[in-house]
């Protein structure tokens, strides 16, 4: 049910393409035989941003298939101490199942039932549209290509997840803002001017949200 694609940018393009096709179509074909993938089927891919030699960066269209891109920094001192404590105490024999596929599917159904009103759907559409045809001059020079409709769908789903985790049955504008960078940072293609000015994708996402009126 859960696949870890470690350092996916070290896999050749053909392997990347096969994985992303499986993510999209939920089945794989081997020797003319098609095998359905289990439900749920989730992929977590990692990239090492430091060492880029010998890597195969994912094309933008393939990156778009990933629901979110989460940045992982160094652990805090407390987190690192906990890593050291656990290092010699956890073995594969002590790892137990904590949730069943049925429970995951059940909770996914609950997330889909979270209410999001028409004004907030319009807000999501406006945010994503701002990445394509920016109203601010500053944004126009920094964005080469904006986000696709997949971004709107992902932002709606992710904001529902945030509301669910906060114990609410409805989405608020803050839910959308909170998860915005994770959903959009890999879907916006920056211009050379943005790179020259030292602007990150997160900087641009903040400008995008600042440019759109909250309903």
List PLM regions with ranges:
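Canonical AAA+ ATPase core
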Residues: 2, 7-15, 23-115, 160-162
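Short alpha-helical scaffolding segments that buttress acidic/His motifs in well-ordered protein cores
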Residues: 83-84, 124, 179-184
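AAA+ P-loop NTPase domains with strong preference for DNA replication initiators
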Residues: 86-171
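C-terminal engagement/docking regions of AAA+ P-loop ATPases
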Residues: 133-215
């Amino acid at each position: 049910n859960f696949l870890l694609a470690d350092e996916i940018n070290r896999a050749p393009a053909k392997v990347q393409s096969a994985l992303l096709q499986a993510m999209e179509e939920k089945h794989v074909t081997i020797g003319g035989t098609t095998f359905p993938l289990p439900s749920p089927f989730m992929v977590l891919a990692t990239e090492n941003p430091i060492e880029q030699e010998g890597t195969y960066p994912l094309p933008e269209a393939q990156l778009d298939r990933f629901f979110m891109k989460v940045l992982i920094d160094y652990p805090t001192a407390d987190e690192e101490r906990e890593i050291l404590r656990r290092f010699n105490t956890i073995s594969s024999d002590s790892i137990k199942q904590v949730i069943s596929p049925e429970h995951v599917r059940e909770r996914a159904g609950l997330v889909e039932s979270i209410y999001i009103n028409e004004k907030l759907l319009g807000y999501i559409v406006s945010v994503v549209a701002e990445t394509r045809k920016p109203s601010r001059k500053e944004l126009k020079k920094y964005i080469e290509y904006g986000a696709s409709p997949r971004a709107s769908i992902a932002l709606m789903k992710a904001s529902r997840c945030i509301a669910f985790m906060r114990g609410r049955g409805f989405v608020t504008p803050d839910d959308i803002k909170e998860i915005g960078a994770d959903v959009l940072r890999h879907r916006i293609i920056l211009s050379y001017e943005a790179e020259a000015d030292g602007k990150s994708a997160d900087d641009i996402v903040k400008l995008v949200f600042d440019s759109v009126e909250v309903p």
